Amino acid sequence: MLFWLVLAIAVASLAARFYFGRDAEDRLAAGEAVDFAHLDLPSRDNAYLMCPADPLICNVKADEASPIFPVDPARLRDRWMEMAAAEPRVHLVGTEKDRQHLVYIQHSFFFRFPDIVTVEFLPTGNGRSTLALLSRSRYGKGDFGVNAARVGAWIAKLKALTEAGGNP
């Protein structure tokens, strides 16, 4: 009897989440905005941070150093937006700093759990640029490496796009 009650509650909870939560999950909640200079990441088990060594922008140690791209920040942003638009279940939910700071939400395939991806594009000089990137799960304590895999895949795609296109 208890099994069926727990199962019914779980099914009802998932159904309510799918029915009511879709639009709400595509917005940033209070406290989810990121300032790379003032990061507060209580848990790193469900997040992956990539930051440049120069210019130093992140106030916490990154999981990986950001690459330098052979394009200016505006072109890097344009290529990023092109790459992100081709990704499944990704929504641009915010922009700041003259569109140099972008926030996306990508939903998992089956349960549609939201992950928040924040990126900021930075000049390094001589027509080159880099970025600060944080991918994190909205829910849960661990992510089974999903955020690190996303960052790796997206950076590989971005490198291919920037090396193919370059500056005009």
Q: Model segments located where?
A:
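Ser/Thr-rich, low-complexity intrinsically disordered terminal regions
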Residues: 2-3, 14-168
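Hydrophobic alpha-helical transmembrane segments
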Residues: 9-11
